Amino acid sequence: MDDMDRLIAEAKKRDMYILMDLVVNHCSDKHEWFQKALADPDGPYAGYFYFREGKDGKAPSNYRSYFGGSAWTKVPGTNKYYLHTFAKEQPDLNWENKELREEIYKMVNWWLDKGIGGFRLDAITYLKKEAGLPSYPADGEDGLVSVAHGALNQPGIEALLREFRDRTYGRRETLTVGETAGLTPETLLSFISLEDGVFSMVFEFSWCQLELKGPNYFWYDRQEWTPEDLKRELFSSHEMAGDRGWFGVCTENHDQPRSIDHYLPREGRNYYGATMLASMYLLLRGTPYVYQGQEIGMRNCAYASMDDYNDVSTHNQYNRALADGFSPEEALRLVQLESRDNARTPFQW
């Protein structure tokens, strides 16, 4: 913590502020809260999470996590399951629980009191879950359905986030950028309004996976796209918001492949193509975010073996492709195109 205090202080001497990544949709399964919940299923900490009884020897509902397989993991020795939108090591926090919310607000204000300048709010549109967490018709051969049906951008999410804002960062001068998957054109402006937005700005992702078919975005379920498609998706939100809202603009992040390989045809993956991509997003209205390595035009890693990939979602997507009839070579090629590890390599000096 001494290092962090020094970083904040030295940054302020230079008229700079530190933004932190704030993850409050879920926590680690090693977190003290979750361990206490497991130790005492009827205790107060169990209410911090989504524990549900299984049904007929199966999970409480048929949600598929974003990293593959059921979004419910069984607690050993019981008939209870816990919900995880992402990996099983990341149990979702129950924001309907008032005590949980108070703990989060206390933690956020503690960091703000230390002098943090603001936050990137991770997976923030997943905080509100559908009441009852019901099953839906399956959307795949595995009999499951995307967890988004019960967890993404649910009614009431804006009211919940406004309470969050008003109890924490909204009380002081801060900068906040929301990772806001699932926002619709009808709700976008209320999140980024310069007058009363939930956040200072949001990342807008509608154009980041044009090559994949929703809502599951399986890497093998691909579609063709054109520069006109990119232009339409890229500009539509900006045209709608006009001068009433503000965006965080990016073409790369830790969840996406490198933009040179992602958006440019093979013959355009050079200095001129990279300069064009940079011009495209640096000239948009908003605050540009340059992802690590993007400033030197880093490329996808394209490893030759699955043994070289670490990302859990990459291995799940690879296995999913194999299960649906793709050869190991075809599945590996999909991984080389889409893996999150493409953006997580050391600097390519």
Where are these regions (language model features)?
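Active-site and adjacent substrate-binding regions of carbohydrate-active enzymes
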Residues: 1-349
